[in-house]
């Protein structure tokens, strides 16, 4: 594992310049200078990202490297959340990852929308872990999936006596010290992507916005709702497709950081136009195809990025 460093400003050079300035004025200034304050400034950026400095991580958000699919695991103190469960391949990657994290129970499981690249291994998750709450967005009957992966998930839920709680915008609840807001879907649309659950999770002063595969029509619904979208970290919608992450939407979210769950395939995602939009707002963009699994640690104020590659 390694930590990414921000490159906007050379804080080492700042320390050197202050030293030189102190010598020029008076050597005694070195003794009286507040070095603790300077060092603290040198390791923490304006957006709260900590560079190679340990923090008391009350919350860790894991964006799994699952190719052009989605799976996010969150642990916050003694609470555990799973958002989506990748595609069918590579087999068992989600369950095995959760087992390595010593997960026994999931307090919340979220299906952003029932496309195969989001629910591919959900049946295995349901079979292998105790689940307290399972939520999804209701979709119109005319676009309800009929393919095997979705039907298998429903059968597995039934076998384990688990019920789906269907949610829409406006629902707010807490799991431990995490505040969760469902921002979408608001209206029904004629494609599964724009019926995705859009969810904001806040821990202390740090917030994460998860958008599933929400496209521009759903983004506009959420903008028009007047909800506060501003978030520290954005999980970029639809793997960086040009139909998502509209400029209007990003201007409301104003993310300091973006994470794109994507793999190498002929779709050539993320699209350049989306990266250009994101660069207008983000200090850094992280991609699972470049960095592998990405883990964000936070104490509710500062954040630290850990990457697999």
Indicate residue ranges for each PLM-predicted region.
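Non-globular, low-confidence helical/coil segments that flank catalytic cores
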Residues: 2-309
């Amino acid at each position: 594992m390694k930590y990414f460093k921000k490159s906007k400003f050379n804080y080492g050079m700042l320390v050197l310049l202050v030293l030189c300035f102190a010598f020029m004025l008076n050597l005694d200034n070195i003794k009286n200078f507040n070095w603790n304050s300077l060092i603290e400034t040198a390791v923490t950026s304006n957006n709260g990202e900590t560079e190679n400095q340990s923090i008391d991580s009350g919350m860790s958000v894991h964006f799994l490297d699952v190719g052009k699919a989605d799976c996010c695991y969150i642990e916050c103190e003694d609470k555990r959340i799973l958002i989506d469960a990748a595609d069918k391949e590579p087999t068992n990657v989600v369950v095995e990852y959760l087992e390595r994290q010593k997960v026994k129970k999931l307090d919340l499981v979220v299906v952003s929308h029932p496309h195969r690249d989001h629910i591919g291994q959900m049946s295995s998750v349901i079979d292998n872990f105790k689940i307290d709450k399972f939520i999804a967005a209701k979709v119109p009957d005319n676009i309800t999936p009929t393919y095997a992966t979705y039907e298998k998930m429903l059968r597995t839920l039934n076998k384990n006596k688990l019920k789906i709680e269907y949610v829409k915008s406006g629902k707010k609840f807490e799991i431990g010290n995490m505040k969760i807001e469902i921002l979408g879907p608001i209206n029904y649309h004629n494609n599964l992507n724009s019926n995705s659950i859009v969810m904001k999770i806040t821990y202390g002063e740090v917030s994460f916005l998860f958008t599933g595969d929400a496209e521009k029509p759903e983004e506009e619904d959420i903008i028009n709702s007047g909800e506060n979208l501003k978030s520290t970290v954005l999980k970029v919608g639809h793997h960086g497709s040009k139909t998502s992450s509209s400029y209007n939407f990003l201007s409301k979210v104003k993310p300091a950081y973006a994470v794109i769950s994507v793999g190498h395939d002929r779709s050539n995602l993320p699209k350049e136009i989306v990266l250009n939009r994101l660069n207008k707002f983000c200090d850094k963009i992280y991609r699972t195809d470049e960095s592998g699994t990405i883990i964000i640690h936070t104490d509710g104020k500062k954040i630290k990025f850990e990457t697999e590659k």
